[in-house]
C-alpha cells in the first residue's frame, strides 16, 4: 500500500484543490510554491521535490476513484495536529485566484470531512483565510 510523508500530504491537499476546477492557474501554482518555501511546517522539506510530489498527486488523481485515493493517503499521513493546517492550505489555494469555483468548494468540504475537522473550527479557519485575502 502506498504511503506519503506529512509534507507530501500537505502538498497533495494544495494540488487537489488547485486541480478541482480542471485548471491549475498560475496564481495557484505560485501560491503552492510560496507556501512550501515559507511556512514553518515545510522547514525540513526538500523544496526541489515539490514538482515531483505534485506530479505524484496528479498521477493518483488520474486513477479510478483518484480523489478518494489521494485523500485517503492524506488522512493516513497527517497527524491530528496538522489537519487544520491542511484545511487552511486548501483554503489558501482556493482563494489565491480571488474567486472560488463551485468544484473547489465541494472538494474543500470533502477535505474537511475526511480530516475530521468540526464545522465550527472550519468556519474559524475559513474566516481567517478570507480576512487574509480581503482588499480595500
Q: What does each of the following model-derived ranges do?
A:
Residues 1-136:
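Small-residue-enriched hydrophobic alpha-helices in membranes
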Amino acid at each position: 500500500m502506498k504511503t506519503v510523508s506529512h509534507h507530501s500530504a500537505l502538498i497533495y491537499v494544495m494540488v487537489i484543490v488547485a486541480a478541482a476546477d480542471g485548471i491549475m492557474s498560475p496564481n495557484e501554482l505560485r501560491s503552492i510554491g510560496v507556501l512550501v518555501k515559507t511556512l514553518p511546517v515545510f522547514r525540513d522539506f526538500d523544496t526541489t521535490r515539490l514538482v515531483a510530489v505534485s506530479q505524484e498527486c496528479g498521477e493518483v488523481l488520474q486513477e479510478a476513484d483518484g480523489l478518494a485515493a489521494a485523500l485517503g493517503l492524506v488522512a493516513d499521513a497527517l497527524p491530528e495536529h496538522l489537519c487544520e493546517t491542511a484545511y487552511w492550505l486548501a483554503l489558501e489555494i482556493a482563494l489565491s485566484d480571488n474567486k472560488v469555483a463551485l468544484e473547489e468548494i465541494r472538494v474543500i468540504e470533502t477535505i474537511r470531512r475526511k480530516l475530521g475537522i468540526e464545522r465550527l473550527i472550519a468556519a474559524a479557519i475559513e474566516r481567517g483565510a478570507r480576512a487574509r485575502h480581503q482588499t480595500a
